[in-house]
Amino acid sequence: MTADRWAGRTVLVTGALGFIGSHFVRQLEARGAEVLALYRTERPQLQAELAALDRVRLIRTELRDESDVRGAFKYLAPSIDTVVHCAAMDGNAQFKLERSAEILDSNQRTISHLLNCVRDFGVGEAVVMSSSELYCAPPTAAAHEDDDFRRSMRYTDNGYVLSKTYGEILARLHREQFGTNVFLVRPGNVYGPGDGYDPSRGRVIPSMLAKADAGEEIEIWGDGSQTRSFIHVTDLVRASLRLLETGKYPEMNVAGAEQVSILELARMVMAVLGRPERIRLDPGRPVGAPSRLLDLTRMSEVIDFEPQPLRTGLEETARWFRHHTR
């Protein structure tokens, strides 16, 4: 399937002013799609950048309000070919720990309203950004897509994980009961340009960049041995669109092949910024799963490109960070 698969199609993107959603908007518009960009929180600079694109229409919508979502679909649905669902309440480990109830409530309402509208208004296909965090118990081997709630389901007080699990179960049931053509993407840790630092919920890479660029030490929660796989946001978007183009699998892990410890990551961030190594470990803070290794067999079958190495992506991200935060 070539890039012109998206030319002339109308794609609705939720969370369009968010980190991942904004990259979907840009890539889809560049490939010839008409993009209906739904957002809730104002971000004036990004809004202006996206509004300047030829085929992007920004629409403020409260996805947690069913009447607001239905109103938007009633007006827009006749032209929608595809829905890309990126909107979610998210944050770092501390944010998820402190606001689990809010996250669960917000995310489960959002996905419920969206899938109901995809069904009721006859949208042809949808892709949902899920999470690799739903593999609650880290397996000894790489987690395959089948190693989810269907194989082992247990309670967790992590509202984010619960919300993503609920969303996947609901999507699966919509697929089975209503024939909804819905796909699920489970990313590793996503990073790249556009992921600004928010002290209250910032992800690991922008948090490290902010500290290192300011000449401060990087604080690592735990002993730094916990490992993650990272995926550049543009590679995530490309892989997700390829999944829609091929329709090969209902669920797919998306991540880089490299497994990097958080301590190694901190050293890499310091190096790309040209800063001396200043790192402090804090064993008393929440660290999440000790590892999150993903089976990438499906992804390797679907994509037609090579994801960029972490070091290369970090260098680009650091350049963006310095240009946009000074």
Curated annotation (Swiss-Prot):
Coiled coil: none annotated. NADP(+) binds at residues 15-21, 129-132, 164, 187-190. The record marks K164 as: Lowers pKa of active site Tyr. The keyword NADP applies. It catalyses: dTDP-6-deoxy-alpha-D-allose + NAD(+) = dTDP-4-dehydro-6-deoxy-alpha-D-allose + NADH + H(+); dTDP-6-deoxy-alpha-D-allose + NADP(+) = dTDP-4-dehydro-6-deoxy-alpha-D-allose + NADPH + H(+). GO terms for biological process: antibiotic biosynthetic process. Pfam families: Epimerase. InterPro entries: Epimerase_deHydtase (IPR001509), NAD(P)-bd_dom_sf (IPR036291). SUPFAM superfamilies: NAD(P)-binding Rossmann-fold domains. It is an enzyme of class 1 (oxidoreductase). Its EC number is 1.1.1.364. Keywords: Antibiotic biosynthesis, Carbohydrate metabolism, NADP, Oxidoreductase. The keyword NADP applies. The active site is at Y160 (proton donor/acceptor). GO terms for molecular function: oxidoreductase activity. Belongs to the NAD(P)-dependent epimerase/dehydratase family. PANTHER family: DTDP-D-GLUCOSE 4,6-DEHYDRATASE-RELATED. This is dTDP-4-dehydro-6-deoxy-D-allose reductase. It comes from Streptomyces bikiniensis.
